[in-house]
């Protein structure tokens, strides 16, 4: 049996995204340890048989002294744990975890590119300044890893084009997958007016929140009874939306903000159409996969990570980024023809079963990692 160590940016989000993988490894007798900066789900991890070790990693910003401390801390922990396999997720855990593994001379290293995020979006002066450093660190990380997992072809193509990684080391997986049993189509959804839309995401600009609000304004002038829901936590991302801005939207009665939840299923169950107008460099948004598994049509953008989940006119619609008018037009299709909700929703479930079953995704990952 193998000793597997995961280095992740937030244990809370990692558990939500990858619980099935962790449970399958523990169930098969492997020793599993998770390293992360947040301790909020330590007890939950322990309950499923996963050891937790806190490691000081700041997932945003660049502080050379603090980051050096993080790397040295990782070197010590990896040396103490002596894992057979080290699997790193997201930017800093990939960069620092792989370097620490090399310095500790322990384990086979796999990196997981779950989207490119903030650094590969719009280029601010700060991003332009940091990018050469990030590229150098990425090249070092990939040079010494045994394999890399990507969630869409665009990200893989970018990383091979700029010579971060050799194609033969890379594997494309269909996101983190979705548990088709836990997220299944409920009974009782009628698809009748008024139609209710829901967006589930971190409350950051790059998830298309502003476009969603503007589309809601456009539609509510014609259809005041439609439901416009928004669910998700506030964030510290550089494009985070402030709570006072949300209060303004709530007072305007343009959106029903539902806050944060541990279980999105009741909210999906009470909604008709899932919307994610993101221009964040996604991997494959799990929120979309969960909605698809529950038999919901999807409106999202023609961007890497999002566009792969929708076959236009089959299980939903793709719209241009930062285009509230086009988004409103796509949303209106379901208002004018509510029958699309049931038909396209059934197609979403079909795609989820064929392509995004979490057990198939995890089997692929474990096969590559040989565990």
Residue ranges and their predicted role:
Residues 15-20, 195, 199, 204-221, ...:
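A conserved mid-protein helix/loop that constitutes part of the nucleotide-sugar donor-binding site
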Residues 36-40, 200, 227-241:
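Glycosyltransferase donor-sugar binding loop
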Residues 53, 135-185:
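Donor nucleotide-sugar binding/catalytic pocket of nucleotide-sugar-dependent glycosyltransferases
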Residues 232, 241-260:
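Nucleotide-activated donor-binding/catalytic signature segment of Leloir-type glycosyltransferases, i.e.
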Residues 269-283, 296:
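Acidic donor-binding loop of glycosyltransferase active sites
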Residues 297-300, 310:
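Short hydrophobic beta-strand element within catalytic cores of glycosyltransferases
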Residues 311-313, 317-324, 333-339:
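Conserved acidic donor-binding segment of nucleotide-sugar-dependent glycosyltransferases
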Residues 326, 333, 340-355, 361-367:
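A short, well-ordered alpha-helix in the C-terminal region of glycosyltransferases
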